[in-house]
Amino acid sequence: MSKVKTRFAPSPTGYLHLGNARTAIFSYLFARHNNGGFVLRIEDTDPERSKKEYEEMLIEDLKWLGIDWDEFYRQSERFDIYREYVNKLLESGHAYPCFCTPEELEKEREEARKKGIPYRYSGKCRHLTPEEVEKFKKEGKPFAIRFKVPENRTVVFEDLIKGHIAINTDDFGDFVIVRSDGSPTYNFVVVVDDALMGITHVIRGEDHIPNTPKQILIYEALGFPVPKFAHLPVILGEDRSKLSKRHGAVSVRAYREEGYMPEALFNYLCLLGWSPPEEGREIFSKEELIKIFDLKDVNDSPAVFNKEKLKWMNGVYIREVLPLDVLLERAIPFLEKAGYDTSDREYIKKVLEYTRDSFDTLSEMVDRLRPFFVDEFEIPEELWSFLDDEKAYQVLSAFLEKIREKKPETPQEVKKLAKEIQKALKVKPPQVWKPLRIALTGELEGVGIDILIAVLPKEKIEKRILRVLEKLS
């Protein structure tokens, strides 16, 4: 058997969709698991919809996910190759020029609609004589090129996920392989490219199943070996409809911008439709996935995308999996974008060390860590009622005095100091912690106040407490 080779072939017409990202991941893992080759091919034959900026973002997002490739192609740079193979099909009688106008074709479609039957081309131009073809060309009539589909033939293939699939050619009829503007169509170029690039396994979404018999016929007509096909089940939203924008963020880019970790997204997408051999385990590194991934473990039924599950998994990566230095490097751009001072890396590293278990994404981190970076904040009117009593004033004054003597440097030392103040002033724990939290953060809830006091520089704590004491006195 030849060396395994797979490909991912996105169109640069928008952001990288999560479903397409999963296809890329499965194709990549299958190739790497089998010590095979992986190809990235940009399918940009449609000049109207293909955009260079989308191509650049696709490449960035794939690299961000940790996917690398051995070969790279753009279909727009391969038109000469496609022309050569179109001519081969014309010469062998497997294709013919079609001079039908858009109006004539629309009339055929309308008749099919009236009869309530699926549309298939009538084959009107299939039997034109060479003289008629020549005459129409001389008259300057625009023409497409259609593939001549054998009538009433059942095309059969064994899908590696879906099993036995049989589709009759009468279901689709002769189809266009080159448009009247000279641009080749998807079903044609994909065959030429997959054959010339030596693709052994075509792994893609199940929405491509209707294309497969057409492509098999082209493989046969050109004398190319037919690759194996694996059609992945669709990804659904939690309402069991196809995953789309109405389910919220559906692109890799959106999750990048929300502060998701590439390793977590890669890991989670891999589990959509694939069952790891080790039951009950969900966290896998890319290297582990390469070792254990097999198409035989891909389910036939649709997978449901659960954003909360992804968020949980992302939190696990932030808390337990990623080295602190990696988390630091990824956190910096988010903190900078929020306008926080990031000049003291050691300070930020200490903040993250103590707080990484309190957020699941880096966008959550920005809100969570505000008290570590923002000194000027308003205390809401309704929170002053917690401060405006004698005990709160005494607690804040005692705390200020103590930290001027010696600032606690760990959460444990902060808790010890709070207990001493509680005992000395004969108050309950909330009467110590609540005034401190409000004075230092302007909030009733948030990151552990013992952590904030341990990490925040002494002069910042003094400044925040003094501001409240001055207002209370």
UniProtKB/Swiss-Prot annotation:
<protein>
    <recommendedName>
        <fullName>Glutamate--tRNA ligase</fullName>
        <ecNumber>6.1.1.17</ecNumber>
    </recommendedName>
</protein>
<keyword id="KW-0479">Metal-binding</keyword>
<keyword id="KW-0030">Aminoacyl-tRNA synthetase</keyword>
<dbReference type="InterPro" id="IPR020752">
    <property type="entry name" value="Glu-tRNA-synth_I_codon-bd_sub1"/>
</dbReference>
<dbReference type="GO" id="GO:0005524">
    <property type="term" value="F:ATP binding"/>
</dbReference>
<dbReference type="GO" id="GO:0005829">
    <property type="term" value="C:cytosol"/>
</dbReference>
<feature type="binding site">
    <location>
        <position position="100"/>
    </location>
    <ligand>
        <name>Zn(2+)</name>
    </ligand>
</feature>
<dbReference type="GO" id="GO:0004818">
    <property type="term" value="F:glutamate-tRNA ligase activity"/>
</dbReference>
<feature type="binding site">
    <location>
        <position position="127"/>
    </location>
    <ligand>
        <name>Zn(2+)</name>
    </ligand>
</feature>
<keyword id="KW-0963">Cytoplasm</keyword>
<keyword id="KW-0547">Nucleotide-binding</keyword>
<keyword id="KW-0067">ATP-binding</keyword>
<comment type="function">
    <text>Catalyzes the attachment of glutamate to tRNA(Glu) in a two-step reaction: glutamate is first activated by ATP to form Glu-AMP and then transferred to the acceptor end of tRNA(Glu).</text>
</comment>
<dbReference type="InterPro" id="IPR045462">
    <property type="entry name" value="aa-tRNA-synth_I_cd-bd"/>
</dbReference>
<dbReference type="InterPro" id="IPR014729">
    <property type="entry name" value="Rossmann-like_a/b/a_fold"/>
</dbReference>
<keyword id="KW-0648">Protein biosynthesis</keyword>
<dbReference type="GO" id="GO:0006424">
    <property type="term" value="P:glutamyl-tRNA aminoacylation"/>
</dbReference>
<dbReference type="InterPro" id="IPR033910">
    <property type="entry name" value="GluRS_core"/>
</dbReference>
<dbReference type="InterPro" id="IPR008925">
    <property type="entry name" value="aa_tRNA-synth_I_cd-bd_sf"/>
</dbReference>
<feature type="binding site">
    <location>
        <position position="125"/>
    </location>
    <ligand>
        <name>Zn(2+)</name>
    </ligand>
</feature>
<keyword id="KW-0436">Ligase</keyword>
<dbReference type="GO" id="GO:0000049">
    <property type="term" value="F:tRNA binding"/>
</dbReference>
<feature type="binding site">
    <location>
        <position position="98"/>
    </location>
    <ligand>
        <name>Zn(2+)</name>
    </ligand>
</feature>
<dbReference type="Pfam" id="PF19269">
    <property type="entry name" value="Anticodon_2"/>
</dbReference>
<feature type="short sequence motif" description="'HIGH' region">
    <location>
        <begin position="10"/>
        <end position="20"/>
    </location>
</feature>
<feature type="binding site">
    <location>
        <position position="245"/>
    </location>
    <ligand>
        <name>ATP</name>
    </ligand>
</feature>
<comment type="similarity">
    <text>Belongs to the class-I aminoacyl-tRNA synthetase family. Glutamate--tRNA ligase type 1 subfamily.</text>
</comment>
<comment type="subunit">
    <text>Monomer.</text>
</comment>
<dbReference type="InterPro" id="IPR001412">
    <property type="entry name" value="aa-tRNA-synth_I_CS"/>
</dbReference>
<dbReference type="InterPro" id="IPR004527">
    <property type="entry name" value="Glu-tRNA-ligase_bac/mito"/>
</dbReference>
<dbReference type="InterPro" id="IPR020751">
    <property type="entry name" value="aa-tRNA-synth_I_codon-bd_sub2"/>
</dbReference>
<dbReference type="InterPro" id="IPR000924">
    <property type="entry name" value="Glu/Gln-tRNA-synth"/>
</dbReference>
<dbReference type="InterPro" id="IPR049940">
    <property type="entry name" value="GluQ/Sye"/>
</dbReference>
<dbReference type="Pfam" id="PF00749">
    <property type="entry name" value="tRNA-synt_1c"/>
</dbReference>
<dbReference type="InterPro" id="IPR020058">
    <property type="entry name" value="Glu/Gln-tRNA-synth_Ib_cat-dom"/>
</dbReference>
<keyword id="KW-0862">Zinc</keyword>
<dbReference type="GO" id="GO:0008270">
    <property type="term" value="F:zinc ion binding"/>
</dbReference>
<feature type="short sequence motif" description="'KMSKS' region">
    <location>
        <begin position="242"/>
        <end position="246"/>
    </location>
</feature>
